[in-house]
Amino acid sequence: MKSLIFVLLLGAVFAEEDKIVGGYECTRHSQAHQVSLNSGYHFCGGSLVSKDWVVSAAHCYKSVLRVRLGEHHIRVNEGTEQFISSSSVIRHPNYSSYNIDNDIMLIKLTEPATLNQYVHAVALPTECAADATMCTVSGWGNTMSSVDDGDKLQCLNLPILSHADCANSYPGMITQSMFCAGYLEGGKDSCQGDSGGPVVCNGVLQGVVSWGYGCAERDNPGVYAKVCVLSGWVRDTMASY
C-alpha cells in the first residue's frame, strides 16, 4: 500500500521536481500551446486550448493560480511571455484523488490570451489516437542529464502503448480515462514531466501528464489522462462559462 500511495501521489506532491528523461530541448516556441502554472513558483504544466481556456491535470488543482504563456527559458524574461491570472479553476466532477481517475481540469483566464507565433491553442480531439501513434510530451526539467537544461522547455517523442501493455504494467490501476505512452524497455519517460502538461499527437491534444511509477523504469511507462474520452466534458464546460 505504501508503494501504491507513493505512485499515485508522485505527480501531485512533487510536481515542481518533474523532469523529462531522454528527451531534448524543444525548438523555441514549437510547443506554443504549452503553459506553466505558477503560484509564486512553477508547479505544473498545461495546454492552451482556446484564447480563454487552459487544460491541465486535476491533481494540479489550486483555487487561484497564474498562467504563464509564451515561455521557453522559464527563469529568463525573453519578451515573448504573457502572464494571466485564473478566474475559475474547475476539476472534472468525477476526478478521484484515490486512483487519479479523470485527472483533468480547466482553467478560465481572466482575460483572453493574445494569440501569436509564441502563443497559440492546440486542437482538442474528435477521436482517439491509434496505438503506436507517435506523440510529443513537453515540460520543464531534465535534472537526470549531465547537461541540466531543465529551465528550457524539454520535449520527448514517444508512442502510445496498447491498453493491454498499459494494464499489464499497472494491474488493476488503468481506467478507461487513462492511457500509457513511452517505452517498455525504459530509458525515456516524461516522469510526470510536467504534471498537467500536454501529449500532442499529429497536432491534437490527446493526453495530459498524470502519473507513473518511478522514472523511465523498465515496464513502467508514463500514464496520461485520455483527453479523447474526456473532451465532451471539456467542451461542455467551456461552453457553459
Curated annotation (Swiss-Prot):
The lineage of its organism: Eukaryota, Metazoa, Chordata, Craniata, Vertebrata. It catalyses: Preferential cleavage: Arg-|-Xaa, Lys-|-Xaa. It comes from Gadus morhua (Atlantic cod). It holds the Pfam family Trypsin. It is found in: Secreted, Extracellular space. CDD domains: Tryp_SPc. Residues 20-239 form the Peptidase S1 domain. GO terms for molecular function: serine-type endopeptidase activity. One of its GO terms (cellular component) is extracellular space. Its EC number is 3.4.21.4. PANTHER family: TRYPSIN-RELATED, TRYPSINOGEN 1A-RELATED. The keyword Protease applies. Belongs to the peptidase S1 family. This is Trypsin-10. It is an enzyme of class 3 (hydrolase).
